[in-house]
């Protein structure tokens, strides 16, 4: 038996209510549970109040990732988007280019969206490796769909620091995050 020699700690997430009382025996088999969300913390506290519980936020640094003023956002858009792109609705997809993240499907859906609203009305920024061996060849799909890599779909494949990523999140209008078979 290892438990008398080493404390058992469960780093845990459970995303929604109702509380999974069927997990009680598993929760009790730990000396401490570290919940990565407030929902998980509340669930564990309900199911096993006798188990030591810590809330360990699974999040980003709120000093870096914070909402900027409208004036700051306008200035950032001027600096980072072409003059003809500053009034577009800008979408942002920040994921690994893996099949389960549906990067190729997103490009097809975005093309249909542009066909409906106008090809000069929106832009998609994809922060990913367009040639990831676990994903689709995004450059090929973009070319196949006839999308413009300067105006419609921008690929950002270089590693960037958190400050620059925070700027990107402030500059865009909508974040897209789709995937299949998570967890």
Give the positions of each predicted feature.
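Nucleotide-activated donor-binding/catalytic signature segment of Leloir-type glycosyltransferases, i.e.
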Residues: 3, 128, 135-163, 167
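A conserved, positively charged/aromatic
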Residues: 3, 10, 20-31
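Carbohydrate-associated surface elements
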Residues: 39, 59
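A short helix/loop element that forms part of the nucleotide-sugar donor recognition site in Leloir-type
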Residues: 66-83
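Conserved donor-binding/catalytic core segment of Leloir-type glycosyltransferases
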Residues: 83-101, 107-110, 124-125
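Short donor-sugar binding/catalytic loops of nucleotide-sugar-dependent glycosyltransferases
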Residues: 94-99, 130-131, 159
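Aromatic "clamp/platform" in nucleotide-sugar-dependent glycosyltransferases that forms part
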Residues: 180
